[in-house]
A protein has these predicted regions:
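N-terminal secretory signal peptides
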Residues: 1-21, 25, 29-35
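Solvent-exposed, acidic/polar segments of extracytosolic/periplasmic ligand-binding ectodomains
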Residues: 47, 361, 365-422
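Beta-alpha junction/loop-to-helix N-cap segments that form part of ligand/metal-binding clefts
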Residues: 63-69, 84-152, 164, 223-230, ...
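Extracellular/periplasmic Venus flytrap/periplasmic-binding protein
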Residues: 105, 150-151, 159-263, 300-311
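Extracytoplasmic "Venus flytrap"
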Residues: 52-72, 94-100, 123-124, 193-198, ...
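Periplasmic-binding protein-like
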Residues: 110, 114-123, 143-145, 188-191, ...
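Extracellular/periplasmic periplasmic-binding protein-like sensory domains
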Residues: 260-332, 343-344, 348, 397-421
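Signal peptide-proximal N-terminal region
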Residues: 46, 69-91, 210-213
């Protein structure tokens, strides 16, 4: 089935893991096929494969609670289909409260005390970097779910770390493809002042200038994460008289920014390009105040009707009684990625796991994805569209799916970015 825009225009076909199968088979049976590689070493009489999962459950519940639902759904389906290497998956989940020091302490407890076979998860980019460094120093494997900074796989990339979600570079490249077509020359940016925000702005500016040398950035605002003075930020941006704004705020910061910027006229007669804003976690809280016409990355959960996504959405709604969010997709895909990597490795020692995950292909609700061997970044993509109002709430309209593989740099560029890459 093709992806289609909200107006019905067909998009590029995407391969489906569910073609010709029942919905139940799409969730479980297809994985049994793809993960039924020889159950060789490490069978250990069915001892569970233990995954130490760490995330910011109390700090960012809008994303991480649906994320937890997603991985729980996936683990249940994988185990029902026979598990991995003939063994069930067992997830030991911990809350880092949005604090790197807590994440490191929990990682130590999971690896050294609980003897987990690998680490997974993470939301904030600084926590993802901390967990990657822990894995490097302690001979563990870390599969990052949500942390978006490119340093995780490039500047600070290392063999023990793989990342699922499309990164700041990838999402910036998707947005720049639209932004470069705008007539605007004078740009301003607003982003949370930590690793994710800094990385997103750096790449957006660099990629946009490469496409549009006439562009200049006339203002930038760096509010502290979770502590935006939205009125002051809106006033400062407006005073710089930009023709377009690049926004990287999310969550409560985004809500405050929209509510303060709108009445001040900040968004009138200005294009806004915004990372993540089309994801339900961040769009839904705005209700009828959701902006109209912003160019965003996001997730059209109610509109996406490919077989793989319908199977996932139906199973998710049946179990949890609500629509999935982007966090749900990330949690779900993360466990399938782990299952595929472990299956390909055939055993659980670190060297085998690294070799197994490098190049591992896995199913997701958006279609097939794969971990690149050269930088350990997955090819999972996301959606680009425009915000609109429908039924008194914000929705993603005129959307298209962008395969992550189409926006990733080639091997030569990765070697320049990632030290020690052969």
């Amino acid at each position: 089935m093709n992806y289609t825009r909200r107006d019905g225009t067909p998009q590029r076909p995407a391969a489906s893991l569910a073609s010709g199968m029942s919905r139940r088979a799409a969730i479980g049976g297809a994985v049994a096929v793809s993960l039924a590689a020889p159950a060789i070493a490490d069978a250990e009489s069915g001892r569970p494969i233990r995954i130490g999962e760490i995330n910011s459950y109390t700090a960012v519940p809008a994303f991480t609670l649906p994320y937890r639902n997603g991985w729980q759904l996936a683990v249940a389906a994988i185990n029902q289909a026979g598990g991995v290497l003939g063994r069930p998956l067992e997830v030991l989940s911990r809350d880092d409260a949005g604090k790197p020091q807590d994440a490191l302490r929990l990682a130590g407890e999971l690896v050294n005390g609980e003897k987990v076979d690998l680490l997974a998860g993470g939301f904030l980019s600084n926590i993802g970097l901390a967990l990657s460094d822990f894995a490097r120093q302690n001979g563990a494997l870390y599969i990052a779910g949500e942390p978006l900074t490119d340093a995780l796989v490039w500047e600070k990339g290392q063999p023990n770390c793989f990342r699922l979600r499309p990164s700041t570079y990838m999402q910036a490249a998707m947005l720049v493809d639209e932004a470069a077509r705008l007539p605007a020359r004078r740009w301003a940016s607003v982003a949370p002042n930590y690793e994710y925000g800094q990385s997103a702005v750096r790449w957006f500016r660099q990629l946009l200038r490469a496409r549009r040398p006439d562009v200049e950035f006339v203002a930038e605002q760096w509010p502290a994460l979770g502590h935006i003075d939205a009125g002051a930020v809106a006033a400062a941006l407006d005073a710089a008289a930009p023709e377009a704004i690049f926004n990287v705020t999310f969550g409560a910061d985004l809500t405050n920014f929209v509510r303060q910027g709108g009445p001040r006229g900040l968004f009138e007669r200005r294009a806004v390009v915004s990372m993540l804003t089309g994801e339900p976690e961040y769009l839904d809280p705005l209700g009828a105040e959701a902006p109209v016409g912003w160019i965003v990355t996001g997730y059209p959960a109610e509109q996406l009707d490919t077989p793989a996504h319908v199977a996932f959405r139906d199973a998710y709604r049946a179990r949890f009684g609500q629509m999935p969010r982007m966090g749900s997709v990330v949690g779900y895909a993360l466990m399938y990625a782990i299952a595929a990597g472990v299956t390909r490795a055939g055993r659980l020692d670190l060297a085998a796991l690294i070799g197994g995950f490098a190049g591992a292909a896995f199913p997701t609700p958006f279609g097939p994805a794969q971990f690149r061997a050269i930088d350990h970044q997955s090819t999972l993509g996301t959606f680009v569209g425009r915000t609109a109002l429908s039924g008194g709430k914000g929705v993603l309209a005129d959307w298209r799916y962008v395969d992550g593989a189409t926006v990733l740099p080639d091997a030569a560029a990765v070697r320049a970015l990632r030290p020690g890459t052969p």
